[in-house]
Amino acid sequence: MFPLSRNIDRYDTTFDHDGLIANAGLVVVATLMSRLGLERLVNTWVRTGSFAPGRKVCTLIAAMLAGATHIDHVDVLRAGATQSVLPFKVMAPSTIGTFLRTFTFGFVRQLDAVAARLLANAWAAGAGPGDDDLVIDLDSTICEVHGRAKQGAAYGYTKCLGYHPLVATRAGTGEVLFSRMRKGSAGSSRGINRFIDELAGILTRAKATGARCVRADSGFWSWELLRTLDRHRMSWSITVINNHKVKAAIAGIANDAWVDIDYTLGGFAQVAETTYVGGGPLKKHRRIVRLVVRRTRLADTAQQALFEHWRHHSFITNRTDLDTIQADQFHRQHAVVELAIRELKDSAAEHIPSGHYPANAAWFACAVIAHNLARWTVLHGKHEPVNTRTLRTRLITVPAVQANRSGRHTLRFPTRWPWQHEFNTILANVRALHGPAG
């Protein structure tokens, strides 16, 4: 054990250790990238015309997993002996920037195809739902930017300059099943029906054979969306806007129909159920749907004659296996989508670096792949659920020294590292995976 230093100023600093690796834990996620065939998939499907696209995408994703939020941060992989723990040649930041600027809309769609096939490989290796039910949460988020030279950046409903990507996440794991970059002025539901069509195809190819249920907030509600979900045999639980028809349906609920429920600490809420008739302007589309309403008390005082006593939150669902209270509990769990979005924006999606819109779309697609690799590292490593920042602190950004003992390469990590057992267990489990067929 080193003695306690009372004079911290006595140390000189040099940057001359060729065998030191700043982010040696990348060996874990790099092993998973290799097992899932990421570089091969990119080389096969992304045809930008540039040399070794798989090498460049892998470089960018590895840097993102190490905490990169700017293109220049890729240089962290070129420091010391970091290259030795990666199964591909690390490219320079200038090369990565040039590569991103070669992207067009079609090339971004090719990168989406890579993400879909990578998802299928990960699920085939054991991370997928198989025959179990799959709950999908839809949401959009604002990726704020600064500067007016960014193509596609605009002011949306939040009055912030940025982009407005759409994501579909898997409840329980936080994986991003599908994503689509959109310009900042896009409405929440823009392109949602085409998005669902593509998402259904991705899940089918990934062999998710169980029941599928989609949850979404009122920004996505439309009768056309319900028809799209019905066409793909997906159940749904979607918040509705309290328009005059919904308010009339709520007003028709008898007072004795409301049931008290467990709610947030210090809060009080009740739920009830009724029906809602709608479907669109065409008579052939008319339908009766199940409307579940939760109301929360605005005030505890009795002096509320001129004001409404309750705030109502309404959603429609076609789930018949849940009673009113269970349906409300299930719908409230849609909030977990915000955790996945927070992790995305706490990592590479924190910053959208380029002035070119397709380059930023490619950056966001790579950020989604990096996010999923972090999730799969936890799942395949059979580790307790942790967020990406915790995973990065415990497993990825741990330093090590490269050593050669009798011809066997060894990474020497710090003694008394608090999570060394978890590190070794996850690495062993990931190494035990078999690569994709073909």
Q: Model segments located where?
A:
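Dynamic "connector" segments at or just before major functional cores
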Residues: 1-187, 192-206, 378, 400-438
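An anionic, glycine-rich sequence signature occurring as long contiguous blocks
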Residues: 2-11, 235-345, 431-438
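Short amphipathic alpha-helical "interface-anchor" segments enriched in bulky aromatics
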Residues: 32, 74, 326-375
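Acidic/histidine-rich, metal-coordinating catalytic segments
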Residues: 139, 210-221
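A short alpha/beta connector and helix-capping loop motif
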Residues: 149-161, 223-240
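Short, surface-exposed connector motifs at secondary-structure boundaries
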Residues: 205-212, 231-232
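Basic, amphipathic alpha-helical segments enriched in Lys/Arg and hydrophobic/aromatic residues
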Residues: 351-417
